[in-house]
Design a protein with these regions (language model features):
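Non-catalytic signal-transmission and effector/linker regions of two-component phosphorelay proteins
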Residues: 1-7, 108-124
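Active-site residues of response regulator receiver
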Residues: 12, 56
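Two-component/phosphorelay signaling modules centered on CheY-like receiver
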Residues: 15-33
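Acidic catalytic/metal-coordinating carboxylates
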Residues: 37-40, 63-67
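Conserved phosphotransfer cores of two-component systems
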Residues: 46-48, 71-77, 95
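Active-site beta3 strand of CheY-like receiver
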Residues: 48-54
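Receiver (REC) domain active-site loop signature in two-component systems and cognate sites
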Residues: 59
């Protein structure tokens, strides 16, 4: 599928979901770093050449909206895809990210949305 080596950061406090997503993305040709909480995710985001973020909304400590807001301050142009088990997150949260999807939408949708975020923007 994707023949690239984009570096993706996945942040989720659910270990099983994080591992499954990492395997899925690696099989699609991506390089993947993971973090199990917002603080760890921010540390990796600051220190690594991350090209896109897949971020869970519901996490202890800092929720995904808070993490996305901090990421926007650090590297405003890095695309962020927010995942949530909830439908209808507040606009103040979804406005901080490039795309939002529910976890129930599945792997093919996740890969397609991530691919769309990584497409070069046409200037014509």
């Amino acid at each position: 599928m994707a023949q690239n080596s984009h570096l993706i950061l996945c942040v989720d406090d659910e270990l099983v979901g994080l591992r499954v997503r990492k395997i899925l993305l690696e099989r699609a040709g991506y390089r993947v770093l993971t973090a199990m909480d917002g603080a760890s995710g921010l540390s990796i985001f600051e220190s690594e050449p991350i090209e896109a973020v897949i971020l869970d909304y519901s996490m202890p400590g800092m929720h995904g909206g808070e993490v996305a807001g901090r990421m926007r301050q650090i590297k405003p142009r890095i695309p962020i895809l927010l995942l949530s088990a909830y439908i209808g997150l507040p606009a103040e949260v979804t406005s901080l990210v490039d795309l939002y999807m529910t976890k129930g939408e599945g792997a093919p949708v996740l890969l397609k949305k991530l691919e769309s975020l990584l497409q070069p923007v046409s200037t014509s």
